[in-house]
Design a protein with these regions (language model features):
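Intrinsic disorder at enzyme termini
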Residues: 1-15
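A non-catalytic, amphipathic alpha-helix used as a structural packing/dimerization or gating element
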Residues: 15-29
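C-terminal helix-coil-helix/basic helical segment that borders enzyme active sites and/or dimer interfaces
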Residues: 32-43
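Short, solvent-exposed loop/turn elements at beta->coil junctions and helix N-caps
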Residues: 65, 133-137, 162-163
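A short core secondary-structure module
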Residues: 154, 158-173
Length: 173
């Protein structure tokens, strides 16, 4: 039997199916049984995120030269689907860390920035964060008012964010 994605339209390669099964087992066996405890305590699941890093999930779509897995976004989507079956917030931690944190550095950062940040972001040692939503502007990127300026060698950020995905952890970069 050929395995297909959840849409049932694209046959999975052997590599994609292996990844899907691995993440499915991880989500079922290691995330689902304990995630409720984190919610009750109001705690961030550092051990789950560390394991996701060791599994290479944060590095799925990035080249090996930066500590990535050399995979593709389809692999990331498969991993996100399986994680979300167990807990959507764990899936969002991965999604935001990769797509909103590390990918802009990979696509638009300097070589120095890639070398400095991507190995830590791909390993899960550090998490990329993203802040868009502002009071009065919601999540409309065109309505943001926060600014950043370089002053005496330091960045000064002036503004307020309502939500910052992946913020408030000891590993947020």
């Amino acid at each position: 039997m050929t395995s297909t994605s959840s849409t049932g339209t694209r046959p999975l390669s052997a590599e994609h199916e292996e990844l899907r099964r691995t993440v499915e087992a991880f989500a079922r066996d290691e995330v689902a049984p304990v995630i409720g405890d984190y919610y009750e305590k109001g705690a961030f699941p550092y051990d789950i995120v560390a394991k996701m890093g060791r599994m290479g999930l944060f590095g799925l779509p990035f080249p090996e030269e930066y500590g990535g897995m050399g995979g593709d976004y389809f692999a990331l989507c498969l991993a996100l689907e399986e994680l979300a079956r167990a807990d959507s917030s764990v899936a969002i931690t991965l999604e935001a860390g990769v797509s909103l944190g590390a990918m802009p550095i990979f696509r638009f950062g300097s070589q120095k920035q890639r070398e400095e940040w991507l190995p830590r972001l791909c390993s899960g040692e550090a998490l990329g964060a993203f802040g868009l939503t502002e009071p009065g502007g919601g999540s409309d990127a065109g309505a943001t008012r926060t600014t950043a300026r370089l002053e005496d060698g330091q960045w000064v950020i002036d503004g307020t964010k309502s939500f910052i995905t992946n913020s408030g952890t000891d590993i947020t970069a």
